């Protein structure tokens, strides 16, 4: 979660940097490679803008991107679930090496890496979907600020290339970010202070960025995080995971009771 927050902070800083670096209009005659990519994104959104509604184009564009990432997200979710399940084992290994000297740290890391390999866990997989989305977000921001037909497009109550005057989109983006993080946290067998704090900090960070960036970017975050909530409920429903975990624990308890009952009967004979 901390790595994810750091990546989002980097994305925000990159957006600010791009704002300063690229300010000239992008057209079909632009020769710079990055400008051509930006214009290509703009053309895709334009193609998806049914009825000339740029907002519809951004919504459909976001859904297409998220749908394309589904296989990767599915792998990430399964890896995260396995990571959550082995947390008790990781804590045992950490308790085994309380010393902070280099040799103890090396041995501890070796055991943890071995545990990861045995359970097919990649601790960096959770950040991969976000890393893939970062260039998309940067290109979208540039398209909204440098391509005229997107910059001056309107949808519902807001202008695509300007800030949302009502703050509705930034608030919705923050709400869906919270729901997404909360659902992922809810299924964890154990919760730590860092995960809990990031669940509340990240929505605030998204809210601040949503207020300061173009409404089109905030709309992208709203749809992207709403899709994430839907995806979590579909692929990693925390309520089903908790129910399955409790059922597994109950089965183990029933086995223990059955063994104890069998032992009592054997003693009576």
Curated annotation (Swiss-Prot):
GO terms for cellular component: plasma membrane. InterPro entries: YidC/ALB3/OXA1/COX18, YidC/Oxa/ALB_C, YidC/YidC1/YidC2_Firmicutes, YidC_ALB_C. Its main location: membrane. Residues 1-20 form the signal peptide. GO terms for molecular function: membrane insertase activity. It is a multi-pass membrane protein. Required for the insertion and/or proper folding and/or complex formation of integral membrane proteins into the membrane. Involved in integration of membrane proteins that insert both dependently and independently of the Sec translocase complex, as well as at least some lipoproteins. Belongs to the OXA1/ALB3/YidC family. Type 2 subfamily. The chain crosses the membrane at residues 45-65, 124-144, 165-185, 203-223. The lineage of its organism: Bacteria, Bacillati, Bacillota, Bacilli, Lactobacillales. Pfam families: 60KD_IMP. A lipid is attached at residue 21 (N-palmitoyl cysteine). It comes from the Bacteria. Keywords: Cell membrane, Chaperone, Lipoprotein, Membrane, Palmitate, Protein transport, Signal, Transmembrane, Transmembrane helix, Transport. A lipid is attached at residue 21 (S-diacylglycerol cysteine). This is Membrane protein insertase YidC 1. GO terms for biological process: protein insertion into membrane; protein transport. It is found in: Cell membrane.
């Amino acid at each position: 979660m901390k790595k994810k927050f750091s990546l989002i902070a980097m994305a925000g800083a990159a957006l600010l940097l791009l704002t300063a670096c690229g300010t000239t209009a992008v057209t079909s005659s632009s020769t710079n490679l990055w400008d051509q990519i930006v214009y290509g994104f703009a053309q895709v959104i334009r193609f998806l803008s049914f009825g000339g509604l740029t907002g519809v184009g951004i919504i459909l564009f976001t859904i297409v991107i998220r749908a394309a990432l589904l296989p990767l997200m599915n792998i990430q979710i399964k890896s995260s679930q396995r990571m959550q399940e082995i947390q008790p084992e990781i804590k045992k290994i950490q308790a085994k090496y309380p010393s902070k000297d280099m040799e103890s740290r090396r041995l501890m890391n070796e055991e943890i890496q071995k545990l990861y390999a045995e359970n097919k866990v990649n601790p960096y997989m959770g950040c991969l979907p976000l890393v893939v989305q970062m260039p998309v977000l940067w290109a979208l921001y540039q398209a909204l600020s440098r391509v005229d037909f997107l910059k001056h497009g309107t949808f519902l109550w807001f202008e695509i290339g300007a800030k949302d005057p009502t703050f509705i989109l930034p608030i919705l983006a923050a709400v869906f970010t919270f729901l997404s993080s909360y659902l992922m946290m809810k299924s964890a067998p154990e919760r730590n202070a860092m995960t809990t704090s990031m669940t509340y900090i990240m929505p605030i960070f998204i809210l601040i960025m949503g207020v300061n960036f173009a409404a089109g970017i905030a709309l992208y975050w709203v749809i992207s995080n709403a899709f994430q909530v839907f995806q979590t409920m579909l692929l990693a429903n925390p309520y089903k995971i908790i129910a399955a975990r409790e059922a597994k624990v109950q089965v183990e308890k029933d086995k223990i009771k059955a063994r104890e009952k069998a032992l009592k009967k054997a003693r009576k004979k």
